[in-house]
């Protein structure tokens, strides 16, 4: 690929929904942004395979707060991401609470997580396994020590491809430039700030960064 030279204020990244989101937020702050994408069709990208869930039931406070921010952002997509060419952006949001169930071996860890939920005002409800049928009569409570869930306005899922498209179009509207190409070495890039959004391909570019691919399997029933 050609050498990408530009002013020192430029920011460079690589493809996918993280790249599009970063381009949006950086462009919104007035930064000059270029995104280098290996495959603009996203045929091998991770995000189109995602179920697109947004939730706040995590252990780490940072993840809980990120989940809360994601919810607020997603609910405002029609306003935040609209452009002249895309006046009605959507991510096909489906608000729906998440139910997480824990057996005796993992209940104690979840009780500790609930302390962070409370501190971060996650709005999580906690019940005993024996109470499950009161709320969810179709679930077998056998072997369940505790369960947590939220209401339908706190969590849910979106169409990740539509979300990416809305982010990308808004970033472009704000001045970001998306370039088809592949970065083989950081020496090819002349920029003040370089952000890698290569995901599971990170080690191909940054061998010293401890990011490795991990296979995930999803079953839809």
Give residue ranges: language-model regions:
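Single conserved hydrophobic/aromatic residue that forms the stacking wall/gate
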Residues: 1-8, 12
């Amino acid at each position: 690929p050609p050498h990408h030279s530009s002013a020192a204020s430029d920011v460079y990244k690589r493809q996918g929904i993280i790249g599009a989101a970063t381009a949006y937020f950086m462009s919104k702050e007035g930064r000059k942004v270029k995104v280098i994408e290996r495959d603009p069709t996203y045929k091998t990208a991770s995000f189109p395979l995602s179920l697109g869930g947004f939730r706040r039931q995590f252990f780490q406070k940072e993840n809980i707060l990120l989940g809360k921010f994601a919810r607020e952002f997603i609910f405002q997509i029609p306003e935040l991401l609209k452009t002249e060419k895309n006046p009605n952006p959507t991510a096909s949001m489906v608000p729906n609470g998440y139910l997480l169930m824990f057996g005796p071996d993992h209940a104690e860890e979840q009780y500790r997580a609930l302390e962070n939920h409370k501190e971060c005002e996650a709005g999580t409800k906690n019940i005993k396994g024996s109470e499950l049928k009161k709320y969810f009569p179709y679930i077998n409570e056998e072997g369940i020590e505790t369960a947590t869930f939220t209401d339908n306005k706190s969590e849910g899922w979106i169409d990740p491809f539509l979300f990416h498209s809305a982010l990308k179009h808004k970033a472009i509207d704000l001045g970001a430039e998306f370039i088809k190409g592949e970065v083989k070495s950081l020496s090819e890039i002349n920029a003040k700030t370089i952000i890698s959004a290569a995901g599971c391909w990170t080690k191909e570019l940054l061998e010293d960064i401890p990011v490795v691919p991990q296979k995930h399997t999803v079953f839809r029933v």
